[in-house]
Swiss-Prot record:
Compartments where found: Nucleus, Nucleoplasm; Nucleus, PML body
A Gene Ontology BP annotation from the UniProt entry: DNA-templated transcription
Domain of life: Eukaryota
Classification via SUPFAM superfamilies: Glucocorticoid receptor-like (DNA-binding domain) (SSF57716)
Organism of provenance: Bos taurus
Alphabetized GO MF terms: DNA-binding transcription factor activity; protein homodimerization activity; RNA polymerase II cis-regulatory region sequence-specific DNA binding; sequence-specific DNA binding; zinc ion binding
Motif (HCFC1-binding motif (HBM)): 134-137
Coiled coil: 139-190
Residue ranges covered by zinc fingers (THAP-type): 5-57
Disulfide bonds: none
GO cellular component: nucleus; PML body
The protein's name: THAP domain-containing protein 1
PROSITE patterns in alphabetical order: ZF_THAP (PS50950)
Chief location: nucleus
Amino acid sequence: MVQSCSAYGCKNRYDKDKPVSFHKFPLTRPSLCKKWEAAVRRKNFKPTKYSSICSEHFTPDCFKRECNNKLLKEDAVPTIFLCTEPHDKKEDLLEPQEQPPPPPLTPPISQVDAAIGLLMPPLQTPDNLSVFCDHNYTVEDTMHQRKRIHQLEQQVEKLRKKLKTAQQRCRRQERQLEKLKEVVHFQKEKDGASERGYVILPNDYFEIVEVPA
């Protein structure tokens, strides 16, 4: 009797030229045999001493390496099945289930409250108000400080210009003073031994210096 695979849809038969091995159901080990029967998933299938499963339905770790993958391990169970036997259509027919009642037109109060909570802004509690006010004060203070800093920078720039002008005037006054000293010295030498001498200075030797406030 030619060995063939008992798996549903599998057409493998023993052929010495094909690298496919066949393994009989472990009838002497009922617990393991039931696992094989459950894995096959064939209705009303009872294996006999001639029933077998081909090696294509076992994963590589189910075989013993020392036996060139020809013998199964003691606890090996077939798990690869591409086809399964279709179920009886009568069993697939399910009893009509009761239809759930239609949803009410008016949503529950809890849903209405939740929707209102999403649409309405949160109530301004004292804590929220204080945080909001503090935030506004912080923004206003920052803007005021920036404006004040800008004003101070402008004032500093003006004072720098005034200081530069005053320094220039001071240098001019120093030069005029040096000229005045030279004139006085010259006049003294000219008068010689006279007890009192008079010096007539030109008008351009004097300049009114305005000190910035």
